[in-house]
Amino acid sequence: MEARDIIIRPVITEKSMNLMSERKYTFIVDKRANKIQIKKAVEDIFGVKVDKVYTMNYKGKPKRMGKYEGRTEAYKKAIVKLTPDSKGIEFFEGLQA
């Protein structure tokens, strides 16, 4: 898997914005990716040093629209903690209030 295939998109919520003060950044990642692959992908794409990676797997929730039943997509979320001497991720810098 390529680095750009592993990181799908950033998570921009109030909670993830509060974590940025602790140098933690949140991403939705490929479900098959492990912590080592996520760490390498973030370091390659953003040019930062990663200290730790926390991952969470979310199952899809059952949803219904009239008589049609389905599920929301399952996904994996990763919180990436940067080392104290590493620079921040530029994409998130403009979002901080």
Curated annotation (Swiss-Prot):
It holds the Pfam family Ribosomal_L23. InterPro entries: Nucleotide-bd_a/b_plait_sf, Ribosomal_uL23-like, Ribosomal_uL23/eL15/eS24_sf, Ribosomal_uL23_CS. Gene3D superfamilies: 3.30.70.330. GO terms for cellular component: ribonucleoprotein complex; ribosome. Keywords: Ribonucleoprotein, Ribosomal protein, RNA-binding, rRNA-binding. SUPFAM superfamilies: Ribosomal proteins S24e, L23 and L15e. One of its GO terms (biological process) is translation. GO terms for molecular function: rRNA binding; structural constituent of ribosome. Belongs to the universal ribosomal protein uL23 family. One of the early assembly proteins it binds 23S rRNA. One of the proteins that surrounds the polypeptide exit tunnel on the outside of the ribosome. Forms the main docking site for trigger factor binding to the ribosome. PANTHER family: 60S RIBOSOMAL PROTEIN L23A (PTHR11620). Part of the 50S ribosomal subunit. Contacts protein L29, and trigger factor when it is bound to the ribosome. HAMAP family: Ribosomal_uL23_B (MF_01369_B). This is Large ribosomal subunit protein uL23. The lineage of its organism: Bacteria, Bacillati, Bacillota, Clostridia, Thermoanaerobacterales. The gene is rplW.
